[in-house]
């Protein structure tokens, strides 16, 4: 296990997670931001790419497992992503199966991954790169303390897909935390 939250466990994906991964990656509603549901081969490639990331980088997209059921309901984690001009940045990415939507799981997992990126991996800034039409994921990024700071266009299956680059810096979260402590102290006076 990599991370644990109140309701979720995040762990490395295993080959046995393939059926659960397919529930997400082959669902056209879940994959609307990609404009393409994955084939079996694409889903296997996705799974094995995460496993290569674990070995190479020490992180990747992890299986999101619901504690109450023990079922894999999504993926969330940290990956290196291009943000233009040959610049790479750690990204907090998330994707959940439809049955896990509207439960706060994406925010819960994304916040845990953001904190892991800062506190364990030592990154000073993380991003989430989100399609311009993916409002639910943008809302998760905002709840994760992120603000849009740039744009890029990804080319996927012959299509140009505009994306927003949401970021948060460690110092911004620390400042927000201290402001909350100060506000709490003032409220008690």
Question: What is each of the regions a protein language model found here?
Answer:
Residues 1-33, 65-189:
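Acyl-donor (CoA/ACP) binding surface of acyl/acetyltransferases
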Residues 49-51, 152-153:
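Short, P/G- and charge-enriched loop/turn segments at secondary-structure junctions
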């Amino acid at each position: 296990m990599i991370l644990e939250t109140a309701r979720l466990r995040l762990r490395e994906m295993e080959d046995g997670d393939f059926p659960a991964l397919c529930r997400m990656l082959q669902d056209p509603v879940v994959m609307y931001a990609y404009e393409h549901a994955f084939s079996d081969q694409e889903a296997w490639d996705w799974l094995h790419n995460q496993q290569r990331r674990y070995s190479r980088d020490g992180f990747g997209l992890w299986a999101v497992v619901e504690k109450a059921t023990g079922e894999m309901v999504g993926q969330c984690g940290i990956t290196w992503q291009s943000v233009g001009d040959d610049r790479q940045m750690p990204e907090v990415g998330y994707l959940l199966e439809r049955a896990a939507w509207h439960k706060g799981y994406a925010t819960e997992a994304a916040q845990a991954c953001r904190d892991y990126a800062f506190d364990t991996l030592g990154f000073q800034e993380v991003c989430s790169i989100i399609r311009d039409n993916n409002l639910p994921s943008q809302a998760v990024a905002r709840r994760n303390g992120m603000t849009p700071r740039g744009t890029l266009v990804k080319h996927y299956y012959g299509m140009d897909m505009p994306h927003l680059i949401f970021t948060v810096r460690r110092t911004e979260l620390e400042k927000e935390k201290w402001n909350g402590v100060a506000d709490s102290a003032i409220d008690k006076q």
